[in-house]
């Protein structure tokens, strides 16, 4: 890159979000110059890496926090439907990418795997049945099986049944059409496609500053983290897909839209094993009920994972805490993000989130034997020697200004950008990776309003259901579901 290079598009961060946007833009505008800048030395080395997230491919098939109970006792399925719709959109893009040479090794990142909700105790069994009944009429959730017989439980989940005393009611809601997703492998394929088709990927380089230019573009200061060399890069559009680092970069840009936003980092830890006897006895992702005070991403689950062709089991998450906004970030990340325009937002959250803080304190006090004791609620026969503790990625949850409370803590993803569309970034975490395509469609529509209409025919090739609500169009859902299953090799297993 020259001393003052130019490029049409800059993507900051080499995770699933930048990878998705880059691949979409390369299809829409093959002549545009695209430069990807990553501070680390590899693709998907932070939150998109397979050991930095659970790989569920969130589709709300098993995550109980997406179907809360209303005060009158009824079940609110609206969030589950929305998240599943978003995942179907992402799945369609993956199918299109597989058919058009963007993705060439589907099994390296996507494998069929049942998604299962697990509860015990009469009251929770009753609640799970009401959840199942509420979802049963929606085509997105059709076909789920109800299992409350201990013998069938043991046949489906032998590892969880071993040494279990079935002294109270248990129940499973079994969705056979779930998946396990390695977002790291997926990111590498998408970015590989971009680079093969003219994009430039810079690794070990960090964006330190963004300055608005008189012509509406941006001048970026890029620093080589190995040599300290500084370079300038001018661009028309910046996407900040830098995970936890997005907040600080958007703050440095000076756009007014970031005012009032803050971030609260929550780390994750998991127990992991590759013992073949254990992985062979658990072929599902099984989600339990979130603990009191736990954030939505804190529901315990026992997952089979496929990483680099090998089977693993992963149990957690157990919360950790660090002021870093990235797993390989800086201790100054959190204090450095506190500004006059967001300090009231942070104070407001500190006052109102006492339950969450107590949950985090309790999690930080857990010893290794304590964590294995929690694991035994899922795997009664678990032996300490089979499991190792790993540190997963950091999630920076969004704190947004609120007139009444000062600030509110949000769990999810938020697109923040300049009104003129010249810069946009993504804040927040779960279920971000698996809803990457709807989020990038939002970025395209918000940031390229003058081109979006002309892009629609191509976008509808990528996502045939674009503009439709699949939950209200069962025939269309069946069509795109069957097509994507074939393209993604999900109907042959």
UniProtKB/Swiss-Prot annotation:
Its EC number is 1.1.5.4. Keywords: FAD, Flavoprotein, Oxidoreductase, Tricarboxylic acid cycle. It is an enzyme of class 1 (oxidoreductase). GO terms for biological process: tricarboxylic acid cycle. It holds the Pfam family Mqo. It catalyses: (S)-malate + a quinone = a quinol + oxaloacetate. It comes from the Bacteria. InterPro entries: FAD/NAD-bd_sf (IPR036188), MQO (IPR006231). GO terms for molecular function: 2-hydroxyglutarate dehydrogenase activity; L-malate dehydrogenase (quinone) activity. Pathway: Carbohydrate metabolism; tricarboxylic acid cycle; oxaloacetate from (S)-malate (quinone route): step 1/1. Its cofactor is FAD. Belongs to the MQO family. PANTHER family: L-2-HYDROXYGLUTARATE DEHYDROGENASE, MITOCHONDRIAL (PTHR43104:SF2). This is Probable malate:quinone oxidoreductase. It comes from Mycobacterium marinum (strain ATCC BAA-535 / M).
